[in-house]
Amino acid sequence: MKVIFLADVKGKGKKGEVKEVPTGYAQNFLIKKNLAKEATAQAIGELRGKQKSEEKAHAELVAEAQAIQAKLAEEATLVEFTEKVGPDGRTFGSITSKKIAEELEKQFGIKLDKRNIKVDSPIRSVGLIDVPVKIYQDITGVINLRVKEG
Protein backbone atom coordinates (compact mmCIF):
# COMPACT_ATOMS: atom_id res chain seq x y z
CA MET A 1 0.00 0.00 0.00
CA LYS A 2 1.32 3.45 -0.89
CA VAL A 3 1.25 6.02 1.89
CA ILE A 4 2.27 9.65 2.38
CA PHE A 5 4.17 10.14 5.63
CA LEU A 6 2.78 12.96 7.78
CA ALA A 7 5.66 12.68 10.27
CA ASP A 8 9.13 11.14 10.38
CA VAL A 9 8.98 7.41 11.16
CA LYS A 10 12.36 5.93 12.09
CA GLY A 11 13.48 3.35 9.56
CA LYS A 12 10.44 3.81 7.30
CA GLY A 13 10.27 7.33 5.90
CA LYS A 14 10.44 11.08 6.39
CA LYS A 15 7.62 13.60 6.44
CA GLY A 16 6.27 14.26 2.94
CA GLU A 17 7.66 11.07 1.38
CA VAL A 18 5.47 8.72 -0.66
CA LYS A 19 6.44 5.08 -0.03
CA GLU A 20 5.16 1.55 -0.43
CA VAL A 21 4.63 -0.19 2.94
CA PRO A 22 2.85 -3.42 3.93
CA THR A 23 -0.95 -2.96 3.98
CA GLY A 24 -1.39 -4.22 7.55
CA TYR A 25 1.38 -1.96 8.87
CA ALA A 26 -0.15 1.02 7.08
CA GLN A 27 -3.73 0.44 8.24
CA ASN A 28 -3.09 -0.80 11.77
CA PHE A 29 -0.20 1.45 12.78
CA LEU A 30 0.67 4.37 10.50
CA ILE A 31 -2.84 5.55 9.61
CA LYS A 32 -4.30 4.88 13.10
CA LYS A 33 -1.55 6.92 14.77
CA ASN A 34 -1.80 9.72 12.16
CA LEU A 35 1.79 9.12 11.04
CA ALA A 36 0.73 8.59 7.41
CA LYS A 37 -2.27 8.71 5.09
CA GLU A 38 -3.18 6.69 2.03
CA ALA A 39 -1.54 7.99 -1.15
CA THR A 40 -4.57 8.68 -3.35
CA ALA A 41 -4.29 10.85 -6.46
CA GLN A 42 -5.92 13.75 -4.59
CA ALA A 43 -3.60 13.40 -1.57
CA ILE A 44 -0.52 13.31 -3.83
CA GLY A 45 -1.76 16.43 -5.64
CA GLU A 46 -2.21 18.23 -2.32
CA LEU A 47 1.29 17.17 -1.26
CA ARG A 48 2.84 18.52 -4.48
CA GLY A 49 0.99 21.83 -4.06
CA LYS A 50 2.13 22.11 -0.46
CA GLN A 51 5.75 21.35 -1.42
CA LYS A 52 5.66 24.02 -4.17
CA SER A 53 4.32 26.66 -1.78
CA GLU A 54 6.99 25.73 0.81
CA GLU A 55 9.73 26.02 -1.84
CA LYS A 56 8.39 29.42 -2.91
CA ALA A 57 8.30 30.65 0.70
CA HIS A 58 11.85 29.34 1.26
CA ALA A 59 13.07 31.14 -1.89
CA GLU A 60 11.50 34.40 -0.69
CA LEU A 61 13.17 34.06 2.72
CA VAL A 62 16.55 33.39 1.07
CA ALA A 63 16.15 36.45 -1.19
CA GLU A 64 15.23 38.61 1.81
CA ALA A 65 18.20 37.29 3.80
CA GLN A 66 20.58 38.00 0.90
CA ALA A 67 19.25 41.57 0.70
CA ILE A 68 19.95 42.03 4.43
CA GLN A 69 23.42 40.50 3.95
CA ALA A 70 24.16 42.97 1.13
CA LYS A 71 22.93 45.91 3.21
CA LEU A 72 25.13 44.86 6.16
CA ALA A 73 28.14 44.57 3.83
CA GLU A 74 27.84 48.21 2.72
CA GLU A 75 30.37 50.64 4.18
CA ALA A 76 27.56 53.01 5.21
CA THR A 77 26.02 50.39 7.51
CA LEU A 78 27.94 51.23 10.67
CA VAL A 79 26.01 50.88 13.92
CA GLU A 80 27.14 53.59 16.32
CA PHE A 81 27.02 53.51 20.10
CA THR A 82 27.97 56.39 22.40
CA GLU A 83 28.84 55.14 25.87
CA LYS A 84 30.34 56.65 29.01
CA VAL A 85 33.91 55.46 29.48
CA GLY A 86 35.88 55.03 32.70
CA PRO A 87 39.55 55.98 33.21
CA ASP A 88 40.68 52.48 32.17
CA GLY A 89 39.12 52.87 28.70
CA ARG A 90 36.27 50.43 29.33
CA THR A 91 32.61 51.41 29.02
CA PHE A 92 30.45 51.60 32.14
CA GLY A 93 27.64 49.65 30.52
CA SER A 94 28.15 46.72 28.20
CA ILE A 95 26.82 46.35 24.67
CA THR A 96 24.85 43.12 24.34
CA SER A 97 23.31 41.40 21.33
CA LYS A 98 19.92 42.82 22.38
CA LYS A 99 21.25 46.40 22.25
CA ILE A 100 22.86 45.73 18.87
CA ALA A 101 19.59 44.36 17.44
CA GLU A 102 17.64 47.38 18.74
CA GLU A 103 20.14 49.90 17.32
CA LEU A 104 20.30 48.09 13.97
CA GLU A 105 16.53 48.37 13.65
CA LYS A 106 16.45 51.99 14.86
CA GLN A 107 19.30 53.24 12.65
CA PHE A 108 18.79 51.16 9.48
CA GLY A 109 15.40 49.42 9.76
CA ILE A 110 17.00 45.96 9.64
CA LYS A 111 15.20 43.47 11.90
CA LEU A 112 17.37 40.65 13.25
CA ASP A 113 16.75 38.30 16.15
CA LYS A 114 19.15 38.96 19.03
CA ARG A 115 19.81 35.21 19.32
CA ASN A 116 21.38 35.23 15.83
CA ILE A 117 23.90 37.94 16.72
CA LYS A 118 27.06 36.12 17.84
CA VAL A 119 28.56 38.19 20.66
CA ASP A 120 30.88 35.93 22.70
CA SER A 121 30.95 38.28 25.68
CA PRO A 122 29.31 41.70 26.10
CA ILE A 123 31.32 44.44 24.37
CA ARG A 124 32.98 46.85 26.82
CA SER A 125 35.74 48.41 24.71
CA VAL A 126 35.84 51.55 22.55
CA GLY A 127 36.57 51.40 18.82
CA LEU A 128 35.52 49.54 15.68
CA ILE A 129 34.23 46.01 16.21
CA ASP A 130 32.97 43.40 13.72
CA VAL A 131 30.20 41.16 15.05
CA PRO A 132 29.21 38.01 13.10
CA VAL A 133 25.49 37.38 12.58
CA LYS A 134 23.47 34.44 11.24
CA ILE A 135 20.77 35.89 8.99
CA TYR A 136 19.08 32.72 7.68
CA GLN A 137 20.28 29.08 7.66
CA ASP A 138 23.67 29.25 5.81
CA ILE A 139 23.51 33.01 5.10
CA THR A 140 25.74 34.96 7.45
CA GLY A 141 26.96 38.53 7.63
CA VAL A 142 28.99 40.92 9.73
CA ILE A 143 27.66 43.91 11.66
CA ASN A 144 30.13 46.79 11.88
CA LEU A 145 29.97 48.58 15.24
CA ARG A 146 31.62 51.80 16.35
CA VAL A 147 31.70 52.43 20.09
CA LYS A 148 32.49 56.08 20.89
CA GLU A 149 33.20 57.92 24.11
CA GLY A 150 30.25 59.97 25.24
UniProtKB/Swiss-Prot annotation:
It comes from the Bacteria. GO terms for molecular function: rRNA binding; structural constituent of ribosome. InterPro entries: Ribosomal_bL9, Ribosomal_bL9/RNase_H1_N, Ribosomal_bL9_bac/chp, Ribosomal_bL9_C, Ribosomal_bL9_C_sf, Ribosomal_bL9_N, Ribosomal_bL9_N_sf. GO terms for biological process: translation. The keyword Ribosomal protein applies. Gene3D superfamilies: Ribosomal protein L9, C-terminal domain, Ribosomal protein L9, N-terminal domain. Keywords: Ribonucleoprotein, Ribosomal protein, RNA-binding, rRNA-binding. The keyword Signal does not apply. One of its GO terms (cellular component) is ribosome. Pfam families: Ribosomal_L9_C (PF03948), Ribosomal_L9_N (PF01281). Binds to the 23S rRNA. NCBIfam families: L9 (TIGR00158). Belongs to the bacterial ribosomal protein bL9 family. This is Large ribosomal subunit protein bL9. It comes from Streptococcus gordonii (strain Challis / ATCC 35105 / BCRC 15272 / CH1 / DL1 / V288). The lineage of its organism: Bacteria, Bacillati, Bacillota, Bacilli, Lactobacillales. The gene is rplI.
